[in-house]
Amino acid sequence: MSINKTLKIATRQSPLALWQANYVKNRLQQRYSHLSVELVPIITKGDVILDTPLAKIGGKGLFVKELENALLNGEADIAVHSMKDVPMQFPKGLELSVICPREDPRDAFVSNKYRTLDELPQGAIVGTSSLRRQCQLKNWRADLDIRSLRGNVGTRLNKLDQGDYDAIILASAGLIRLGLTERIRSFIEIDTILPACGQGAVGIECRVDDRDVQSLLMPLADQTTTYCVLAERAMNFHLQGGCQVPIGAYAILENNQLYLRGLVGDVHGSQILSAEGQFELSLDFESSQSAVQKAEELGVSIAEQLLQQGADKILQAVYQS
């Protein structure tokens, strides 16, 4: 792109979304000192409708549609998203260009009364609107009273502080990025609650034909995070899942081995299906395209294991409810 042109970043207006957009802006300007970068804050449907669970109004895709429209009509050059909010498919003409380094992928236990999930008394009120968290919490502790909790991070913390809940569950990455680490009473380990696909990662979407912008973005990509998140998303896509379904996935890349664990649960926690596997990624010898293909094949493989266990029946029941 022309050095005189301003790069415009579409972003939601929540504090966390603005942090992510500014993170991308700062990284770009550190690398390209003469590049002018401007934020284009946009209110999305998901930010406006706060009194209804996301699963009832179309899932987390509601947080990205208006940003994608800004890309398509030329109001913005790129859009910055939390990867766990990004739908599996993109509108024609748009693509996921870059996935940035991942923050802590775990969920966080936040409470003014208790230090851990284990300390919660019988019948404790726990706030979350995530079906993924709900099914795993109910499977672990059927006695817990899980209640809906919508809004940005500050809104959710305020509801906790007002006494509406004994505890709430939030993504630790958001709290860390907003400088609210002190609100985390404990991190919930992966074995207790498996994260959402892409949780903790920031993605950048742009137009397919905008090669100049894509070349600017490439230095921001994190190879390890990319392979892990693409494996998680491939699993989700093969399950025909979305962002607001009781599906969890988490991949790690260590010593050229890509490990992926996946989970599907019924919303009441009465049935949890899980599967895991690994593929070798010889990063020193394989092209990035070949590694991406292998990562996605691993995701499909884990999805197939879950489908063989009956995941499709569980998800069908969720969609019909």
Swiss-Prot record:
Cofactor detail note: Binds 1 dipyrromethane group covalently.
Broad EC category: transferase
GO MF annotations, alphabetized: hydroxymethylbilane synthase activity
Keyword Ion transport: no
GO annotation terms (biological process): protoporphyrinogen IX biosynthetic process
Assigned keywords, A-Z: Porphyrin biosynthesis, Transferase
Gene Ontology cellular component list: cytoplasm
Reactions mediated catalytically: 4 porphobilinogen + H2O = hydroxymethylbilane + 4 NH4(+)
Residue numbers bearing the S-(dipyrrolylmethanemethyl)cysteine modification: C243
EC number from the UniProt entry: 2.5.1.61
Pathway: Porphyrin-containing compound metabolism; protoporphyrin-IX biosynthesis; coproporphyrinogen-III from 5-aminolevulinate: step 2/4
Cofactor(s) it depends on: dipyrromethane
PANTHER family: PORPHOBILINOGEN DEAMINASE
Note: The porphobilinogen subunits are added to the dipyrromethane group.
Record-stated family: Belongs to the HMBS family.
Protein's job: Tetrapolymerization of the monopyrrole PBG into the hydroxymethylbilane pre-uroporphyrinogen in several discrete steps.
Record-given protein name: Porphobilinogen deaminase
Species for this entry: Histophilus somni (strain 2336)
Organism taxonomic ancestry: Bacteria, Pseudomonadati, Pseudomonadota, Gammaproteobacteria, Pasteurellales
Gene this protein is translated from: hemC
